[in-house]
A protein has these predicted regions:
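Peripheral, non-catalytic segments of secretory and membrane proteins
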Residues: 1-245
Length: 245
């Protein structure tokens, strides 16, 4: 939709910004740990690790980061009835979208043990697409605002997500054979990958304007609280996967 001067004032809660990055980092660390454990000799278990890594990255590293990050967005000077609420359909779709895309991306990286630049580039592009796709589908789920975007932020966010994803995945998959016992090196790659997710999110967020749908009834805050609870459950599952995957 077109941007105009009637948009609602926005400011940000620093605590939720930091928390959203840390949640993404947990998801990314778990994802790379699970991918590290994949080998060419373990069929069904390899598929389990692939699916689990996609759920951790898509559901926690991307989806949970997005919705916790959106809790940092404070609209209309904090008025309780003016904060972002979500509809169920697009919110659910935004959860499954990155998981499906990442299944393709991470499968490509497992086609050859050491990876090659073509597969890594394709995987980086798909991962960046998963991040962007989740963000904008998730935004479609906002039920009490019409949303507008600055084009330069949309483009910049896409570039950040693709480039940073490519860097993190290329370093990880080219060097993972020498990183079997180097958890801190995998953590650094995860930090870059989480930076791709967070960088994309906040670049897009600062270029977003919110136009309140004044015809709506005063909303309940239940959808906001439910989303945070779901994110907390997913992070807990990620921890269990890390310990027992």
């Amino acid at each position: 939709m077109a941007l105009n001067s009637s948009h609602v004032a926005v400011h940000y809660n620093a605590g939720f910004i930091v928390l959203s990055y840390l949640v993404s980092l947990v998801g990314c660390i778990t994802t790379l740990e699970l991918l590290q454990r994949r080998t060419s000799r373990r069929g069904l278990y390899n598929w389990y690790l692939l699916v689990a890594s996609c759920i951790c990255m898509g559901g926690i590293g991307i989806w949970s980061m997005h919705f916790i990050g959106n809790r940092a967005i404070v609209l209309n000077d904090g008025n309780a009835g003016s904060q972002i609420l979500y509809s169920g359909g697009f919110t659910a779709a935004s959860f499954f979208l990155p998981i499906v895309v990442l299944l393709v991306a991470f499968y490509l990286l497992g086609v050859v043990d050491r990876g090659n630049w073509y597969y890594i580039a394709a995987s980086g592009l798909l991962t960046g697409t998963a991040v962007c796709g989740m963000h904008y589908v998730g935004q479609l789920g906002i039920s009490n605002y019409n949303i507008g975007y600055h084009e330069q932020n949309v483009v910049g966010a896409a570039i950040i997500s693709v480039v940073a994803s490519f860097i993190a995945l290329s370093v990880f998959f080219k060097l993972r054979d020498t990183w079997t016992d180097s958890w801190w090196k995998r953590s650094l790659c995860a930090a870059v990958l989480a930076g791709a997710v967070s960088g994309m999110h906040w670049t897009a967020a600062v270029g977003t304007v919110y136009h309140y749908r004044g015809t709506l009834k005063a909303p309940s805050t239940r959808s906001r609280e439910q989303t945070v609870i779901v994110c907390a459950v997913l992070v807990s599952i990620s921890r269990l996967q890390f310990d027992h995957g």
